[in-house]
């Protein structure tokens, strides 16, 4: 039973990330990576939008009230470290950027997306 729940959560997370990527692409963003892993951590989606390098954390919850609080300080720190590592190791892709930001995308059980741009400052990491 637990394995089924874990697989269901995994597939649900993939669907939320796919929905998020499509939403950004509709806005004209270029997806650079999905589920990027490096020694510092994992980043759900990395994209380029209007010259800005965007690191996106996607969260899905049944209860929308829990969504905004579902990204912990520890997760933000790891995301910041992973983003720094990405920029250092992908300077050929990131050399012409005008800046970077961290977005949080909250996906409710109803499938609605809420994109929170600049959910966290890069300086806070």
Where are these regions (language model features)?
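Acidic-basic catalytic patches of nuclease active cores, encompassing PD-(D/E)XK
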Residues: 1-34
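Catalytic cores of nucleic-acid endonucleases
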Residues: 2, 60-110
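Short, surface-exposed charged micro-motifs
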Residues: 35, 44-46, 104
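A short beta-turn/loop motif at secondary-structure boundaries
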Residues: 35-39, 94
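A generic beta-sheet turn/junction motif
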Residues: 38-40, 49-51, 108-109
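Conserved catalytic cores of phosphodiester-cleaving nucleases, focusing on short active-site segments
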Residues: 43-66, 79
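Short, low-complexity, polybasic intrinsically disordered segments
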Residues: 107-125
């Amino acid at each position: 039973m637990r394995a089924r729940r874990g697989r269901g959560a995994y597939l649900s997370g993939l669907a939320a990330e796919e929905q998020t990527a499509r939403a950004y692409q509709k806005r004209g963003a270029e997806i650079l990576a999905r589920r990027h892993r490096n020694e510092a951590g994992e980043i759900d989606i990395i994209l380029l939008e209007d010259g800005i390098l965007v690191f996106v954390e996607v969260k899905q919850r049944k209860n929308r009230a829990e969504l905004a609080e579902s990204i912990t300080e520890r997760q933000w720190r790891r995301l910041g470290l992973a983003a720094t590592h990405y920029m250092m190791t992908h300077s050929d892709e990131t050399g012409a950027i005008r800046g970077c930001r961290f977005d949080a995308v909250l996906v409710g059980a109803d499938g609605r997306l809420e994109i929170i741009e600049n959910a966290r400052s890069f300086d806070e990491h």
